Amino acid sequence: MAEKTTVRSVTYDLLRSLGLTTVFGNPGSTEQTFLQEFPGDFSYILALQEASAIAMADAFAQVTGRPALVNLHSSAGMGNALGNLVAAYHGNTPLIVTSGQQHRELVIGEPYLGNREATTFPKPWVKWSYEPARAQDVPEAFMRAYALAVQPPAGPVYLSVHMDDWNQPMAGPARVRTVSNRFAPDPERLRLFADRISASRRPALVFGPEVDRAGGWDAAVALAEKLRAAVYGSPLLDRASFPEDHPLFRGPLGMSVKTISDRLAGHDLVVVIGAEVFRYYPYVPGDYLPVGTELVQITANPEVAAAARVGDSLLGDPKLAIDQLLDLVAEGSARTAPEPMARPRLLPQVPNNPLTPPEVYAVLSRVRPPDSVIVNESTSTMAQQIEWLPTVRSGSFFATASGGIGWGVPAAVGVALADRDRGVSRAVIGLIGDGSSQYSVQALWTAAQHKLPIVYVVMRNNEYSILKSFAVLEETPGVPGLDLPGLGIAALARGWGCRAVDVETTEELEQEFKTALDADTTTVIVVRTQPQQAML
């Protein structure tokens, strides 16, 4: 006979079996029946605002390679979290997001803190959204949520649970299942792709974030070297999938239709692996591909394959596909290897005042530890980061997968927590714009409370520089609200419990960064910089 217990007890046993023992959230009254008598072998990561909770969990899941559990407060908490939920969805991050629903006896009367149409609210930014019809269905709903979250394309799922369900009687234990989280490509179609690649005179490889997520970094390098092919990063990368200091690396493709087409001119075949075709913004008209250029795409995401504007697609795990391509494609020894990407790295003999972003990155290139990880949300300076701080290892660069800001500060917290969880010691560097730093700023408190080894470098140019750059490109002068005077970023960081300093010179930046690496808490370094036009 199954032992009689409660829905809550059975669910926690299930979560324990699935390895879901870290909960990110901000508790509310409708969630306290779930959180009561919180198990000692679980960890609760308190975020002071729900957008921070989602981004922390997102990065934590990416680094650990395991799904993460997020507990939000009813509809209000979901509303606060939605912006960063969009990023998790686009980034294929397996999150199980939950929130409390009002008591079943009250919900018919639209009570205070009732979550009206709870399963509709997070759509379309979740793979599945469900509210169990019976209390006894809660554990099985979690099992199904887990299975859906990890299966490709991975992504967030949502459960709404009535607050009175947790203490209802139930016979345990829950049924625990395992599911596959990858699938191999169609071998016949992959062979056709391999034949086209082998016949190509001047192929280009475009690697997207799916490659790094699948553990395909080394395989991607091997394929590029066997083909002697130019390698580009897909537009708006949230994960790097190829060493950016490699001689075959040609930089990111760009963002607009015309820019991408121009970059690909001269290639007869473009092989896109683990990326969209393509993530465009802004609209600059042009040909989707140069005349005479063909394209093939390999992705684990059917929606990404269906949305491609050009080319032929193949579904399958990117790493499995690359591993098989290595055996199928012909050696490219007859091809002329592309010229290495130019890296001018020009600096003035006398430092500017205020400093320029390249001057800031030049300092960081000298002093950052080689095994450090970068979280970037300085959107107008990403091109300079690739030039001065290239990503050279798998899992060492993260950025938001959506167009919104407010992900980077809490994501750095999630990375550092994940490193601690898996016993890895490395510095986490958050490269943050001053505008971005004001979103999800509450995450600094969580970082300080956990004494995380994060160094935030905030470039204070007193404006939304990326938006001013778009205004020039899109010919939209006179847009209000693009200047940010009067921000006391360091004072604010100190208020959250971080060590924080303002610097203005390269010498000050170098010294404070070195000091931050030895500090026993999170440090925020605010650097006054010149505005610059972003490379769009």
Where are these regions (language model features)?
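Phosphate/pyrophosphate-binding active-site segments
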Residues: M1-T6, Q136, S160, G172-A174, ...
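N-terminal alpha/beta PP-like core and its mobile active-site loop of ThDP/TPP-dependent enzymes
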Residues: A2-V329, P370, S425-A427, T446, ...
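Active-site diphosphate/adenylate-binding microenvironment
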Residues: V7-Y12, R16-T21, N26-S29, F34-Q36, ...
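Short, small-residue-rich loop/turn micro-motifs
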Residues: P27-G28, S99, M163, P235, ...
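Thiamine diphosphate
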Residues: T98, L106-G114, M255, S261, ...
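A structural motif corresponding to the C-terminal end of an alpha-helix
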Residues: W125, V363-S372, A493-C498
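Conserved short-loop catalytic and cofactor-binding motifs
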Residues: S129, T178-N181, G208, L248, ...
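Histidine- and/or cysteine-centered catalytic micro-motif in compact active-site loops
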Residues: G208-E210, L236-L237, E276, T379, ...
